[in-house]
Design a protein with these regions (language model features):
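Generic secondary-structure signature for well-ordered alpha-helical cores
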Residues: 63, 169-172, 198, 202, ...
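Acidic/histidine-rich catalytic neighborhood of metal-dependent amide-processing enzymes
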Residues: 141-227
Length: 304
């Protein structure tokens, strides 16, 4: 009896999972035209009028999902801040994402217009464009949507909107308040973001921060990342002759700034990539659990 009960529970869970997957797929297909219209909006951060059109589109979508939306002025392009309060006593989860895209270089694209999404199928020769009617083919795992920002980073935002639409249509609410922080200059290194975080500290406060961006594992499997690499920058200046000198006269006599700099850089890491700068790892501790998780990530060496 116990084994039958366990089997029944397991079957119900599997059926529920399949049901959610089928619903998610159906909603995704229903929203393809909306996604294509979203991708059709150029989003080069160097073109302010393009970003303004994207802000208008996203604002309308979020208001329809009961968000309070406002722009936060920065020293460069504005941020878009959207809040959905479920209950004031609940924790708040902030989601950061960016909706600008890199400038388009048509010579790198195999389609006439990178802002006109195309459905493509993987073949032995790469990817080839196919009719959009094939999007309903549930058995084909080799379909891809090609357009500027289809993955980085409009795709995650579109999925986020569809998930919220599902919850709203089914009278369901998450167990937390939602805060969206949308950046429009990520591809430009977000020059206005650092100061904005300080200036709007109270408005950006949250209990948890999730980032809807970042690379996927080369296996193609959905990837959750529980931490991000930071960055530290500095400027090194090496000195040499006041003006260019002829190597036949002064080669190996005057110091070569490029050689000096290469020696400094070469001294910073060993042959295995470990940083040799004293104190670099002094405040870093990895538990056995974390080490086990990291070691369990499949190797990518063969694919890269």
């Amino acid at each position: 009896i116990i084994s039958i009960f366990i089997f029944a529970v397991g079957s119900l869970q599997l059926m529920a999972q399949r049901d959610y997957q089928e619903q998610a797929r159906a909603m995704g297909i229903e929203n393809i035209e909306k996604f294509k219209s979203f991708l059709a909006l150029p989003n080069d951060a160097a073109q302010k009028e393009q970003i303004s059109a994207n802000i208008d589109w996203e604002t309308q979508e979020l208001i329809a999902l009961d968000f309070e939306v406002k722009t936060l002025s920065t020293s460069h392009l504005p941020l878009l801040l959207a809040n959905k309060i479920i209950k004031k006593k609940l924790p708040t989860v902030a989601f950061y994402l960016h909706l600008d895209g890199q400038a388009v270089d048509l010579s790198k694209w195999n389609q006439d217009d990178p802002y006109s999404a195309e459905l493509m199928q993987k073949t032995s020769q790469g990817f080839e464009s196919i009719d959009w009617e094939n999007i309903t083919n549930a058995d084909n795992e080799d379909l891809r949507i090609f357009a500027r920002s289809s993955a980085d980073d409009k795709g995650p935002f579109a999925m986020f909107l569809i998930a919220l639409e599902y919850l709203k249509n089914n009278n369901k609410s998450p167990a937390f308040n939602i805060k969206l922080i949308i950046d429009f200059e990520e591809e430009q290194s977000s020059p206005g973001l650092p100061q904005a975080v300080k200036e709007y500290k109270e408005e950006l406060l949250a209990d948890v921060l999730l980032i809807l961006d970042g690379p996927m594992h080369s296996s193609g499997l959905p990837t959750l990342v529980f931490g991000n690499r930071g960055i530290a920058t500095l400027t090194l200046t090496t000195y040499g002759p006041l003006t260019s000198q002829h190597s036949g006269h002064y080669g190996n006599y005057l110091p070569n700034p490029a050689l000096a700099l290469s020696k400094v850089l070469g001294s910073m890491k060993d042959d295995k990539g470990r940083v040799l700068i004293p104190g670099f790892y002094s405040d870093i501790f990895l538990s056995d659990t974390v080490k086990g998780i990291l070691e369990g990530v499949p190797s990518e060496e063969a694919s890269i």
